[in-house]
Amino acid sequence: MGQKVNPVGLRLGINRTWDSRWFADGEQYGKLLHQDLAVRAMLKKRLYQAGVSRIIIERPHKKCRVTIYAARPGVIIGKKGADIDKLRKDLSVMTEGEVHLNIVEIRKPETDAQLVAESIAQQLERRIAFRRAMKRSIQSAVRLGAKGIRINVSGRLGGAEIARMEWYREGRVPLHTLRADIDYGFAEAKTTYGIIGVKTWIFKGEVLEHDPMALDKRLATESGPAGEGGGRERGDRPDRGDRGRRDRG
């Protein structure tokens, strides 16, 4: 089961917490949920070049606090903060209220699963060989401290007539171990042959105590604020290096 389920959802309440942190009654819940979806979609599209990894939305007392984790915060802030001011105004219109905007820099984007997946997708769109892109990302992640990484790509790889899936893994990626701190990311590469899906799992270590805020604490130690607006499991198999497996589909 751990091989199939989303590793973030599986660990919610254990060593991960929700990215939307607010409470609403039945009448307001649907409205606020759709606002969250619209805000996330707009930010991901508008700030794609900034390398956005996570978007945290909190709603304390009729206000909205949005925290953006990005690899290139300067792209968001803009010259003399002009871009972030415009972004805050646009978010205020979408949420129909006051918005506090915080930007947090990700100092090691090579070990962030979402950013790794998006980087590989961008390389595939530039016609770089998928094996080269995968191996390069794996080497960078391991060099910068990741204890394990696995990357899946699926689709018409290399323009093949029949779609297939290939994966590479380095180190341990224990998907069944609930105390494991596993970062997960997904991206799509829109190529001339069709869409190629990219999935990334990065193992950061184990969280021994029950702490749903463990990820936030780790990111706080690794990152810095860039700007502010107001027996053995299947996943524990010995390292097989860069061996990949193909599945025809």
Swiss-Prot record:
The entry lists its GO molecular-function terms as: mRNA binding; rRNA binding; structural constituent of ribosome
What SUPFAM superfamilies does the annotation carry? Answer: Prokaryotic type KH domain (KH-domain type II), Ribosomal protein S3 C-terminal domain
Is Lyase one of the keywords? no
Biased amino acid composition, Basic and acidic residues:
230-249
UniProt keyword annotations, A-Z: Ribonucleoprotein, Ribosomal protein, RNA-binding, rRNA-binding
Region named Disordered? 215-249
Q: Which InterPro entries does the record cross-reference, listed alphabetically?
A: KH_dom, KH_dom-like_a/b, KH_dom_type_2, KH_sf_prok-type, Ribosomal_S3_C_sf, Ribosomal_uS3_bac-typ, Ribosomal_uS3_C, Ribosomal_uS3_CS
Q: Which residues form the KH type-2 domain?
A: 39-107
Top-level division of the source organism's lineage: Bacteria
Return the GO cellular component terms, semicolon-separated: cytosolic small ribosomal subunit
Pfam family membership, one: Ribosomal_S3_C
Which GO terms fall under biological process for this protein? Answer: translation
Q: What does this protein do?
A: Binds the lower part of the 30S subunit head. Binds mRNA in the 70S ribosome, positioning it for translation.
Q: Which PANTHER family match?
A: 30S/40S RIBOSOMAL PROTEIN S3 (PTHR11760), SMALL RIBOSOMAL SUBUNIT PROTEIN US3C (PTHR11760:SF19)
- Report the family membership: Belongs to the universal ribosomal protein uS3 family.
**NCBIfam families noted in UniProt:** rpsC_bact
Q: How is the subunit organization of this protein annotated in UniProt? A: Part of the 30S ribosomal subunit. Forms a tight complex with proteins S10 and S14.
Mind telling me what this protein is named? Small ribosomal subunit protein uS3
Q: Which organism is it from?
A: Caulobacter sp. (strain K31)
